[in-house]
Amino acid sequence: MEMENSASQQLSISVSQIVLRQREYFLTNETKSIDFRLKQLKKLKKSVEKYSDDIYEALWKDLHKCKEEAFLTELSIVINEINDHIKHLKKWAKPKKVKTPLYLMPSKSYVMYEPFGLALIIAPWNYPFHLMFAPLVGAISSGCCAVLKPSPYSQYTSEVMQMIIDDTFDKEYITMIQGHRDVNQALLSQKFDFIFYTGSPDMGRVVMEAASKNLTPVVLELGGKSPCIVDKGCNIDFAARRIVWGKTINAGQTCVAPDYMFVHKSVRKELIAKMIEYVEKFYGKDSQESDHYCRIINDKAYNRLVSYLDEGKIIYGGQCDAEERYIQFTLLDLSQQTTDNRQQSWLMLGVMKDEIFGPILPVIEFDDIDVVRDFVVNRPKPLAFYYFGEDENAYDLLGKTTSGGVCINDTILHVGNDHLPFGGVGESGMGKYHSQESFLVFSNKRAVLKSSNKIDFAMKYPPYDKIDLIKKLM
């Protein structure tokens, strides 16, 4: 016990010293220079390109993620984000003039963007490179210093990211600290100026509680159960292909993956047949033999997912291999629940309580879209919402539901558009990022009003005998 306490104290001291050195460096104001920020972004891009083969190899070892998928979902997103910030940073960082009311004249008003200061970025294991470096780009472009904490579960990728950070930046500017829960606790006990967390809602609550002690602003990129609705009038072929892709990319270990699917009874049979056709077209008859099909991250996650397979009727899939942590894409029919209250019956199932985060897709048949809408509305607000069907119903659902993002007649693609803000709402998170939103989220919007030193507005002073005139000017 004494040894554990001693190790904990040493870790706390080490983390405290890192934070202290970064705060001292930030106070030199060097990171506030636009030229400095652009230089760091270009250095980061060069290092990412230098280590790209190592990143690909690490992602393969951690997740069985093929090079093509790693490029599309990890490296290209980060490189594009860096390029976007390099191109637009000067414009984004320029003070923004705003109108000044007549009764405050003669004055000038503007908003200036200054870095929060020291940022803590905690990233998950499912897209370990993308979800660490994309927020980091925002921290750099805003002028922050940063401490990075990767997930211990994607260890190979964490090691490569450590090499990139150590090779690119001075530790008093940007540094990475690896470890498990003890490191998280040590970091969250420190006073940061901003915390950016991506991960589970449960850990998000821990982060928010820790941040509240210092009133530290946070962005929480969490998850949740993102519904997918396939209505009559949809393009069944497109719906099948796009849902299978959205659910099987990274073996379903994606925060915005379709979590469960409501399908109208009139299209159910044809949709299921098409989905089976496409999953075998993508990965072959045996997806375990495909180099393009990922694996589950660890044994704990694998065992949790396997337990869901007994909670419904398997329409397709269900094959597993514990040694490889392989789970076949599985369609799980929940429509056969025969209790008086089907919704209550579904909600008793683990597969409908928890975010699935794997290649298992519950299928629920419906014939009344209003019932589906009410089901979604009465659940925690999801990170994403997917609808396949006619435009009229799509826009009606948009107006009566809430989510972090939406795709109509597709899945996941909204995340790939860097012109759209990405983030959750309610239990699926708070705060948005990507492109300019990333710059803004790490920046304090400082309101500035500069009054004239030659003319004064005398009516604003007591005894307020001109109040009627002031009212007319307001």
Indicate residue ranges for each PLM-predicted region.
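Short, well-ordered beta-strand elements within core beta-sheets of diverse protein domains
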Residues: 24-30, 121, 228-230, 260-263, ...
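Structural signal for hydrophobic packing residues in well-ordered secondary-structure cores
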Residues: 30, 45-48, 52, 63, ...
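Residues at or immediately preceding the N-termini of alpha-helices
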Residues: 15, 34, 52, 236, ...
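N-terminal Rossmann-like NAD(P)+-binding subdomain of aldehyde/semialdehyde dehydrogenases
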Residues: 1-110
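Conserved C-terminal structural/oligomerization subdomain of aldehyde/semialdehyde dehydrogenase
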Residues: 2, 36, 327-474
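ALDH superfamily catalytic-core signature
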Residues: 6, 169, 202-346, 408, ...
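Residue-level signal for inorganic ion chemistry
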Residues: 37, 82, 143, 174, ...
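Rossmann-like NAD(P) dinucleotide-binding subdomain of oxidoreductase/dehydrogenase enzymes
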Residues: 102-238
